[in-house]
Amino acid sequence: MLDVKVKIDLVKPIGRVGFGVPLILEENANTAKSYTECSNLSEVITAGFAATTKTYKVASTIFMQDNAPEKIAVCATTDPTATWLGDVSNTGKDWRQLLVVTNDSDTAISVSAIMAKVETLDNKLYFADLEANDSTSLTVSGINRTILFYCNSSEDYPSPAA
């Protein structure tokens, strides 16, 4: 039996511990854009999301954090998110947290459909936001994989990114 040696270095901080790769998914887009993992904002632009887009703004907010993830993923689908989540080739990728950028005015209905789909996935989480004054009734009983934010949003993108 071998002894285990542990070296503790108080000068060097531990690395960043992450919770997986956040995915910024634009639903109901005019043009689909393939799943791309990005380490910085220039890679988000290369993936097809201009600096004026909601997707870019969410990515910028994520990368501005003190303990930002090493990488994020971006993607756009012409379908609703719940439909996109039904394809195992999309859910089998390395992302873990889902942030949806939408052009749909029926946000609460979309949130309900996405919640229902994500709850069937073992290793995914959904971060959703609704306006603080939203009167939509959402069933939250038995929900384990969805985090809802109710807030007064003055921005064009999901508050959970911040």
Task: Give residue ranges: language-model regions.
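Surface-exposed assembly/interface segments
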Residues: 1-162
